[in-house]
Regions:
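Catalytic cores of RNA-modifying enzymes
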Residues: 1-167, 172-204
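Accessory RNA 3′-end/elbow-binding domains used by RNA modification enzymes
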Residues: 1-13, 17-34, 38, 42, ...
C-alpha cells in the first residue's frame, strides 16, 4: 500500500487533477490529493499526498507559496492571462521605475477580486462556467497577503519576470491584471512557475515521466517521502506503555511538557499522530496510525 508525499514538477497543459489521476494508476492507490491547485498553463511544485497521508492535505493547503511569473504589459484578456481572448491592447510607455513604484502598493495585506475564470462558486455555480457563457457576476474582494513581490528581470520594454510569495487564495493572473490596471496600460500573466509550496521546493520535485520510469522498474514507492517529514517543524516525542495504548485507541492521555504541537511516535518508531499538549494533557490533532513505513 502506498503512503507518503511526492512532490511533482507539474508539466504545462496538465490540470492538477490530471496529475493525481496519473499517479493513482502508477501507484495503484485511489486515495490521492494535492495541496494547492495550479492552472493548466502553470508548471512547478505540486505536493501530492498519497494514501493515509491525504490526512495532511488540510495543513499543507494553508501555507504560503512562491511563484515566478511573466508579466506582459499593454494587453488585457478575459482570462487575465495570455491564453484568453484579447479585450484591449495599448502601447506601453512606463519604465522600470514606474513598475517598481506600482509594485510597492501590492505588498502586504491587500484585497483581491477573484477572476471570473476561476473555480469559485456563486450561488452553487462555478465562476468559469458562467464566464464561458459570457456572464459576469459580482465577486466580493478577498483578503490576501503578498509577502514578497520583486522584479527578477526586465525582458523587454513591455515584459517583466517577477517573483511573488503570497498567501493561500492569491490569483497571480489577477495580480498581473491589477498591476497593469494600476499602470494604466493593462497587463496579463503569460507564464507561471511555482517554486515553493507547503515548504516543499523544486529541488525536491520529480517529473511525471520520472514516476512512470520508476513504476516500470517497480520502484515508484521509493519516491514517496514519509508524511511526518511535512511536520518536521514540530518537536518529536516517543510514547510507550499506557500512553501508547491510549493513543492507539484514539484517546488523549496525560503528558507533561510545554504547550504546543508535537510529532508523536510509538515505541516501534512508527509515526502515530500530530498531537498537541495543553495544560498537561495530550490530545490528537490528526492521527496517522494506519500509515505503513516506506522502506
Amino acid at each position: 500500500m502506498a503512503n507518503g508525499i511526492i512532490i511533482i514538477d507539474k508539466p504545462a497543459d496538465w490540470t492538477s487533477m490530471d496529475v493525481c489521476s496519473k499517479l493513482r494508476r502508477l501507484l495503484n492507490e485511489r486515495r490521492i490529493g494535492h495541496a494547492g491547485t495550479l492552472d493548466p498553463m502553470a508548471t512547478g511544485v505540486l505536493p501530492v499526498f498519497v494514501g493515509r497521508a491525504t490526512r495532511a492535505v488540510e495543513f499543507a493547503e494553508s501555507g504560503g507559496k512562491t511563484y515566478v511569473a511573466g508579466l506582459k504589459l499593454g494587453l488585457e484578456t478575459d482570462t487575465q492571462d495570455s491564453t484568453g481572448q484579447v479585450l484591449a491592447e495599448q502601447s506601453v510607455t512606463c519604465d522600470r521605475a514606474a513598475v517598481e513604484a506600482v509594485l510597492e502598493g501590492f505588498r502586504g495585506d491587500i484585497l483581491q477580486v477573484p477572476p471570473m475564470y476561476s473555480a469559485l462558486k456563486v450561488n452553487g455555480k462555478k465562476l468559469y462556467q458562467l464566464a464561458r457563457k459570457g456572464k459576469t457576476v459580482e465577486r466580493k474582494p478577498r483578503p490576501i497577503t503578498i509577502f514578497g513581490l520583486d522584479i527578477l528581470r526586465q525582458d523587454a520594454p513591455d515584459h517583466y519576470t517577477i517573483q511573488i510569495t503570497c498567501s493561500k487564495g492569491t490569483y497571480i493572473r489577477t495580480l498581473c491584471h491589477d498591476i497593469g490596471q494600476k499602470l494604466g496600460c493593462g497587463g496579463v500573466m503569460d507564464a507561471l512557475r511555482r517554486t515553493e509550496a507547503a515548504g516543499f521546493t523544486l529541488e525536491q520535485a520529480v517529473t511525471v515521466e520520472q514516476v512512470v520510469q520508476a513504476a516500470e522498474a517497480g520502484q515508484a514507492h521509493s519516491l514517496l517521502m514519509p508524511v511526518d517529514t511535512y511536520f518536521a517543524r514540530y518537536p518529536a516525542l516517543t510514547i510507550q506503555g499506557k500512553a501508547e495504548r491510549l493513543c492507539r485507541h484514539g484517546n488523549g492521555f496525560p503528558w507533561e511538557g510545554e504547550n504546543g504541537r508535537y510529532r508523536v511516535y510509538g515505541s516501534d518508531g512508527s509515526f502515530l499522530m500530530l498531537g498537541e499538549i495543553l495544560d498537561g494533557q495530550m490530545k490528537t490533532v490528526k492521527n496517522f496510525l494506519e500509515l505503513e513505513s516506506q522502506e
